[in-house]
Curated annotation (Swiss-Prot):
Pfam families: zf-CCCH, zf-CCCH_11, zf-CCCH_UNK, zf-CCCH_UNK-like_4th, zf_CCCH_5. SMART domains: ZnF_C3H1. The lineage of its organism: Eukaryota, Metazoa, Chordata, Craniata, Vertebrata. It comes from Homo sapiens (Human). This is RING finger protein unkempt homolog. The gene is UNK. Residues 10-19 have a biased composition (Low complexity). A zinc finger (RING-type) spans 766-801. Residues 241-253 have a biased composition (Basic residues). InterPro entries: Unkempt-like, Unkempt_Znf, Znf_CCCH, Znf_CCCH_sf.
Amino acid sequence: MSKGPGPGGSAASSAPPAATAQVLQAQPEKPQHYTYLKEFRTEQCPLFVQHKCTQHRPYTCFHWHFVNQRRRRSIRRRDGTFNYSPDVYCTKYDEATGLCPEGDECPFLHRTTGDTERRYHLRYYKTGICIHETDSKGNCTKNGLHCAFAHGPHDLRSPVYDIRELQAMEALQNGQTTVEGSIEGQSAGAASHAMIEKILSEEPRWQETAYVLGNYKTEPCKKPPRLCRQGYACPYYHNSKDRRRSPRKHKYRSSPCPNVKHGDEWGDPGKCENGDACQYCHTRTEQQFHPEIYKSTKCNDMQQSGSCPRGPFCAFAHVEQPPLSDDLQPSSAVSSPTQPGPVLYMPSAAGDSVPVSPSSPHAPDLSALLCRNSSLGSPSNLCGSPPGSIRKPPNLEGIVFPGESGLAPGSYKKAPGFEREDQVGAEYLKNFKCQAKLKPHSLEPRSQEQPLLQPKQDMLGILPAGSPLTSSISSSITSSLAATPPSPVGTSSVPGMNANALPFYPTSDTVESVIESALDDLDLNEFGVAALEKTFDNSTVPHPGSITIGGSLLQSSAPVNIPGSLGSSASFHSASPSPPVSLSSHFLQQPQGHLSQSENTFLGTSASHGSLGLNGMNSSIWEHFASGSFSPGTSPAFLSGPGAAELARLRQELDEANSTIKQWEESWKQAKQACDAWKKEAEEAGERASAAGAECELAREQRDALEVQVKKLQEELERLHAGPEPQALPAFSDLEALSLSTLYSLQKQLRAHLEQVDKAVFHMQSVKCLKCQEQKRAVLPCQHAALCELCAEGSECPICQPGRAHTLQS
């Protein structure tokens, strides 16, 4: 007994033996395939009739909702033929109403919604490999749960052939063997590869990655509508949802357009008012083949089965991409024609990012570029692409389309707030670790102790001014230096940043918990703190040309990383919005009287006189700042030499960044207010619409009641006209328009009615009072019944006095 929906029976007597054997052979079907072949869209949805189906918009229901969505079950009869053709469409079928004059017995294919009769036919269902990937649930990202194409070899099924097709195949093969295997077993995979091979033979450039990235789905298909048999493997688009804007002509980000994509569903690109000028993706094809995303993820089919049916049209990587090296040496960064090198994104004057090769003569020093970018508050990730973008493989970094400018494909101005506070700490740490690996430590001769200080100095050099990590690590270094004895450290340049400078983000907008977690990830061993404190145990005479800060030596040109709070000499108060990292905070809490004599001598003062300044520094050093010559926001540094201009420039850029952030905040507030106002208007409009609907329903009910009443009155009027009762006479001016027979009939009717009236008048006169004509007559003393009792009291009998009676009657 066959498990498939098409029962196999005895073939026609004229069929060849081989074809008869294949028809008689049962086609086993998997349970999932059997369910779809037998029941998909063949019955009406019972929930939709009750208006309870939740899969109507978008329409993903297993059953049909409207008649034009109904699918006839495909059956192979006992004679080996199908109940309707899998290829020839019916010309009488109405796609709007879903009706055909032949009904279900029509031998041709009906073009239902989604072309379900052909896709789910025994001949084609799950016989071809789908070129789209699957999501986390195993469903097709393009066609959803009910995809009619196979996702993997385990989902393939062999097609069921019509006996006439089998006879034609056998006649074509002329008795060759192994026909069944080539038809039944290899048809699905071979058909997919054959279609791609045909396309590649027509246009060999489709094998080039750059050509696919620049031209795939950018031109309309040259074949007539509904005649393209290449399916989704066709490199040309067939509708607006399949179209991809050419990256040569249009610049757009890899993010989906909010006007087109809602949730997981891609809508009509025509809903976007900006059209092709929109800076976001409009279709899934545009997003997958965007230069920032293209080939950035491994292909699932290649990982699972080792082959991909999409071939060169696959948007995912088929070859294992080598990871970027941790140590980017100049020799490895040289670009070659075969394999372009990685691209660094330099900020240009226009605010965009320009790709520059590390080996280019215009490429700046990595550490200088990193420090510059970090000081602006927007750290650039040297280990990959800029923040917020997906890292591309090395072989796609340098792709530039013909006729394009030098701008990188993803070089767009970032939207306000693209760097959230919870990402700043992690980006700083990542940049620091990259810088620690990239920075050569053997560029100049150093003393034995100098490399121990360098990691923390480098950390301060790559962090932006006033950032949470800058103030925290600066306070950490200062606390460590203040709590240890002097050491013979040689003169070195400490690129410490100003801790009193305002942070790039306002204090109220900084998420302290995120910075705390970022600081917890810091490996203090990378800074050489243990070796640094060990080195400080060796006490020697300090260098005469340096400044003594709590037992350490700093060059006079370097800023002092201490906040401007000069009132306290026993503790360190950080101006950073995040909690400072203090390595030796317990030393700062010790009273000044516990300092040893050697320390007092080294500091050049006596603890008993209370002349020690902040953190044990000689108070004479702070005389320049205690006089109030500097504002509270000015850092306690020596503003002289070439560093003053650089500091002024950094402050100016910081002010510009702060003003830009304020403008973004104002714009965001205005947009939020406008959105709130629109939302309120929409709610009010909805309420008014509901009220109008209720009023309309009430008016409709009143109208129906009035119509019923009018109908009743019309029926009553017709009944009166048809009965024997007297009718209202028409206008006298209309009598001449009536026919003579009508006038005779009217005259006869009126005479009959007049006789009835006379009889009624005579009867009423015989029983009513002759005087008042209202009360009934009563018997008078004269035995006459002419007057009522009331009239008889004041009047005499009119019968006894005829003259009186005549007067009464007159």
